[in-house]
């Protein structure tokens, strides 16, 4: 698809954040990261709509739209990090992606969107990142994940647990960027670590589709400045 050259800016921001950590060498901060990568090509080994894929978490996912490959890849990586996080001290989990066109309609060019699960909201994770971003010119808007955003991904039949997404573009889907976060939480198994669980885990999803920069043009580097300010400078 034309214009997808910048669809890897989420993974690139993870690399950029770690490059910054290598320069600053902050003490008392443990950070682990991964870059979820997938080449969404046609061919004999491609994936197709209506295919049912079992996620790393064991959840059966029916593919609704092959253009939503990013949330599939991130869900498996998040599932692994979720399993490791339960044994860590005060862990915070994040996913970062140029995920939806919907967020561009919602907030306009230049603004990242951050949205928390229940445990992260209790600790005001999104407002912390938003305030840090304001201080360094890396603007964020806070979105809320509602129950409808979780219910939307209910599997329509007995054969699957979840529906990856509908077959409309996110720009034509109400709550398009929040729905994606709800799916990632459920597909990764992170919904088993909410406020009512024995081991709650803080998780925030960052959609940088509107803030990653123009194409063609120079990438913005968002959300690296906000994350450095929030978790290094202000830590």
Tell what function each PLM region has:
Residues 1-235:
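A generic structural signal for tightly packed, nonpolar segments enriched in small/aliphatic residues
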């Amino acid at each position: 698809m034309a214009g997808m050259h910048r669809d890897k800016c989420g993974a690139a921001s993870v690399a950029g954040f770690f490059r910054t950590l290598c320069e600053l060498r902050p003490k008392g901060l443990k950070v682990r990261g991964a870059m979820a990568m997938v080449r969404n090509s046609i061919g004999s080994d491609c994936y197709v709509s209506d295919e049912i894929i079992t996620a790393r978490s064991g959840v059966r996912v029916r593919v609704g739209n092959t253009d939503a490959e990013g949330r599939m890849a991130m869900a498996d990586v998040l599932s692994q990090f979720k399993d490791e996080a339960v044994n860590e001290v005060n862990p915070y989990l994040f996913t970062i992606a140029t995920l939806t066109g919907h967020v561009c309609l919602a907030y306009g060019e230049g603004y990242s969107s951050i949205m928390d699960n229940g445990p992260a909201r209790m600790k005001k994770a999104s407002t912390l990142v938003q305030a840090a971003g304001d201080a360094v010119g890396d603007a964020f808007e806070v979105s809320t994940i509602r129950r409808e955003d979780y219910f939307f991904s209910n599997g329509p039949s007995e054969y699957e647990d979840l529906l990856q997404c509908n077959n409309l573009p996110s720009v034509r889907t109400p709550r398009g960027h929040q729905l994606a976060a709800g799916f990632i939480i459920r597909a990764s198994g992170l919904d088993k670590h909410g406020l009512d669980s024995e081991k709650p885990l803080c998780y925030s999803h960052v959609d940088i589709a509107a803030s990653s920069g123009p194409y063609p043009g120079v990438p913005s580097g968002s959300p690296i400045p906000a994350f450095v300010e929030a978790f290094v400078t202000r830590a």
